Amino acid sequence: ALFIGTAPLSALASSSQNTDPYIASFKAYSDEIKALDTSTSKAASNTFQTYADEVFSVEQKAGYIGDELPIPKAVKVMEGVYTVVGSFIWGTPANFGLNNNLSAIIFEDGVFIYNGGPNEAVAYSFHQQIKRITNKPVKWLAVENDQGHAYFGSSYWYDVGVKNLYSEKRANDNFHQIFEETKDRYAKGRGTTITQSVYDVTDKFTTFSDTKTIDVGGGETVQLINFGGGHTPSMTGMYIPSRNLLFSGDLGFNERVPGLLNDSFFKEWISSFEKMASMVPSDVTVIPGHGTPTDMATLKRQTYDYFVELYQEVQKVVDSGGGLAEIDAIDQSKHKDRPVFSQLSISNARHIYNELMAQKSL
């Protein structure tokens, strides 16, 4: 995207669906001159067309042209590992759509990014922080699932030369299918200007179904693992054995109440969490999808135990023949101080109830 100062002027023309008004004006003027059908007008038309093409090339190689946004400062989790902890609420214009975590891991051969960011401006701003930490190039990017705040910034990373992009296959296929719909929703909820420059680079991703191991130099590897669905139908978790470091994706929430979406299934979430916990050491350091870095015991309490306990209470209502009134009355006050509790407590309970009732009717 092209920004001057803090006022956005235009969006990067990275695809036919995202036309920079500045570039488009030269293309339109070129067409108007060409329509005059004289040798002079044709020469002038070619000049303007060439200029527009050159501007487009410069903007695309830059990925983003504009100010660095005041996103949260990356925190050092351990040596060579940094995470920007996103807002604990929804993505909004005020937080630039950044309500999940963005991480950078520095290896001998370069930097590995986990999550592309909700837009190119946030991705660029995170990149500037990385450049102040290390002069090593960003070489790899993995995204946690098929949500916009994981994927949309990927077009920035691709434009600046990151060619090793990774995602679980089902998530990548799904994001391609819902790209325009999701982009429109993000534009309405987080701002048109900050969203409009993103474009679909799912065809540039290397996909996997279960696991994929990546050699990142210095004898270290990164393991990409689809631990299973739950919050979303599938996901890309990441484990680095040499650092004993786990990226749980949205299977793990810390502080913030985890949320059940339209395509979420709580039983699958519980099962996937169990699988994840069984595949890593108990003393692993965890960077969750939402919330601050933590340990597995805390993550289990904040996510897994939350769902198991709520499930048990909802099951009691189902067994006694109760309905939504009883579901809404379930006491969840122990979680009342967690961010977005008021927005998610009842909807989560209702989601579990509806899921149980649907299974009961089979």
Residue ranges of predicted features:
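Metallo-beta-lactamase
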Residues: G110-F112, P118-E120, T213, T221, ...
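Active-site HxH/HxHxD metal-binding segment of metal-dependent hydrolases
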Residues: K131-T213, P233
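Short acidic-hydrophobic surface loop/beta-edge motif
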Residues: A74-V77, I105, D210-G217
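Short Gly/Thr-rich strand-loop-strand
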Residues: P70-V84, T202
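Conserved beta-strand hairpin/beta-sheet module of binuclear metal-dependent hydrolase folds
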Residues: M78-Q129, M238, N244-G249
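N-terminal export signals
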Residues: A1-S14, K42-S45
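Divalent metal-coordination and catalytic microenvironments
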Residues: G80, I105, N115, I130, ...
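Accessory terminal helices/loops
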Residues: Q17-G66, S278-D283, T292-L362
